[in-house]
A protein has these predicted regions:
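Short, solvent-exposed loop/turn elements at beta->coil junctions and helix N-caps
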Residues: 30-34
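Conserved strand-to-helix beginnings and helix N-cap segments that scaffold or border functional pockets
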Residues: 67-68, 278
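Short beta-strand-to-loop junctions in surface cap/lid or active-site-entrance loops
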Residues: 42-51
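Active-site/substrate-binding loop(s) of hydrolase catalytic cores
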Residues: 50, 65, 72-73, 77-211
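Conserved beta-strand elements of the Class I
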Residues: 52-55, 265
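C-terminal accessory segments enriched in acidic
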Residues: 1-19, 23-29, 84-86, 153, ...
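Active-site histidine-acidic residue metal-binding/catalytic motifs
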Residues: 57-62
Length: 291
């Protein structure tokens, strides 16, 4: 399984927009914000439920085709909903999404996505472009946005630690866009999708026994249907790493757990997995079913 993107950012944007135009009765297209290089961040809502589940990918260029697959999954779920189909002979898509709708954001870092595809020349802002070129970093698997900031470490969590001088939490447009949508919508969970070796990481709170138990229970449900390894997220009380930092501090999953206080899971699908679409489609439906 290659991790190089197949689609352009514009392909993904218009794929979601066209789905909302075709399935107007039960979808809504929305731009939640703009990147620092002035690219819009699209979101597609599917279903009519009062609560929602956020499904997000594309924080880093290392996510590769995950943004592509999540966008395609959104369109497929729309088709399943309209036709009243059951997925894998078990999940009644229309019934589940009218209970809890999905808010799908396939590419939260469109600048990084395009940099991985076409290099630094795709950055429109000449100042940002020159700054990135001066860093002399390879663009393959580029983990940052157009300002060279890793979004996965930019959220204002407890015990946040700066990775660079003058870097502050929520300094990036993309980060603030997600924080705004998290706080605006009444949600029941966050699922982020990326590539790794097949694991589900569930976030924890320092003094949140009930929250931690609920998050663990939902993570176990997803583990059973995926076969992935279950991994516990770290809190500050769990100790810091050898370099004095904690990989979960500053992450969107930890922020969501601390501020929204709803279950937050990072789903890392194996790069070699043959049917990524099946996993991306099944896990959000299983999550809603298990609520």
């Amino acid at each position: 399984m290659e991790t190089v993107q197949e689609k352009t950012y514009e392909n993904i944007y218009y794929l979601l927009w066209e789905a909302a135009q075709r399935y107007q009765k039960f979808t809504q297209f929305r731009v939640i914000g703009k990147s620092h290089d002035d690219r819009m961040i699209p979101m597609l809502e599917i279903g009519t439920g009062d609560l929602c589940i956020f499904c997000i990918a594309g924080f880093s260029g290392t996510d590769g085709q995950m943004s592509d697959r999540l966008a395609e999954t959104a369109v497929e779920l729309c088709r399943n909903y309209e036709c009243g189909w059951t997925v894998q002979e078990f999940y009644e898509v229309r019934k589940l999404l009218d209970q809890t709708r999905l808010c799908i954001i396939p590419v939260v870092n469109p600048d990084g996505y395009e940099i991985c595809r076409k290099g630094y020349g795709t950055v429109r802002n000449p100042i940002f472009r020159q700054m990135l070129k001066m860093q002399d970093r390879p663009t393959d698997g580029f983990p940052c946005n157009a300002r060279g900031i890793e979004l996965k470490q930019n959220f204002p969590t407890n015990y946040y630690q700066r990775q660079k001088i003058h870097q502050e939490p929520a300094s990036e447009n993309e980060t603030r866009a997600l924080i705004g949508i998290f706080q605006e919508y009444k949600s029941a969970g966050l699922l982020t999708f990326g590539y790794s070796h097949g694991k589900i990481i569930y976030s924890r709170q320092e003094k949140g026994f009930a929250y931690n138990q609920r998050n663990y229970r939902l993570a176990r449900y997803l583990q059973k249907c995926s076969g992935y390894r279950l991994e516990k997220g770290k809190t500050a009380s769990g100790g810091l790493g050898s370099k004095g930092n904690n990989p979960d501090m500053g992450s969107p999953e930890q922020f969501y757990a601390e501020v929204i206080r709803q279950p937050s899971l990072a789903i890392e699908i194996p790069v070699s997995h043959r049917d990524i679409m099946k996993e991306i489609r099944q896990l959000p439906l299983e999550y809603i079913y298990s609520l």
